[in-house]
Structures are given as structure tokens and as C-alpha cells.
């Protein structure tokens, strides 16, 4: 998340576990507040199905489904092909900023090759599709946070029943 945006919010951190985040591990979650009201979140997430293994990411979005930012934290993708998900290699990941995710069934939020509106990069399909799917699942999760906020404040970190 750009520092000029990040520093305009108050933040509270939580631990969370949910299948929409790509694995069965506990992930960090930061709820962002504006005027003492929760408005967005940053979530650590995993794209488990990258070409060369799991891709760890941060996704930030408003509760209405608008993506603030997405960044890859770590990956083992093929140099010169799949590694274009990394901001230090390519700006491909920045195309998600400002996009909206309507639902898990959002037909537009997939690669153009599969009928969606997102351009992949040359030479790779699996890696950009994995990242795209992970961002979509994570934003769907973020959109549910207002419904589980009371549970978060009670220290309950696993919410499978809310996300079926």
C-alpha cells in the first residue's frame, strides 16, 4: 500500500484463518479505520497454485470491494517468465489498483484469456491466473470483515462458516 494512503488510516492488527486466504495457516490482518470507523483491510494471503509453488501476497481493499493495492511478498516463479508478478520486475501487479471485485463468481475478474478483463503477461498463464484468483478470493474475504468484526475483537480468528 502506498505510504501516503497507509499513513492516513488508523490500524488495528488481528490474526485470521480462512480458506479464502489460500491455505490453512494463520494470516495477519490489519483493519484500517477512518474517523474511528472500519473502512478497509490489509490481509496477508497465499496463492497456493502458482506455477512453481505458493505465492505470498498482501492485498488491501475497501469493504465495498475496491482494491487499494496488491503486492507479492515472496514467490519461486520462473525468472524471466512468471516472476513478472514481482513489482521489482514488472508493474503488472499494479493493474489491480482501483478495480472492484463483485463476488467470488465475478466473471470480469479473471484473465482475458478466460473471458475476463485482466491482461496477463507474455509467456505465462498459470502464475497470473493464480495471483488473480488469490486477489479475488482475498477481496471477497475483506468484504465480509464488517460482518465478523465483533468476533475479531473477541479474539476469535477462524471464520469458515461466514465464507461458504
UniProtKB/Swiss-Prot annotation:
Its EC number is 1.18.1.-. One of its GO terms (cellular component) is plasma membrane. The keyword Electron transport applies. Its cofactor is FMN. GO terms for molecular function: electron transfer activity; FMN binding; oxidoreductase activity. Disulfide bonds: none annotated. The modification FMN phosphoryl threonine is found at residue 125. Part of a membrane-bound complex that couples electron transfer with translocation of ions across the membrane. PANTHER family: ION-TRANSLOCATING OXIDOREDUCTASE COMPLEX SUBUNIT G. This is Ion-translocating oxidoreductase complex subunit G.
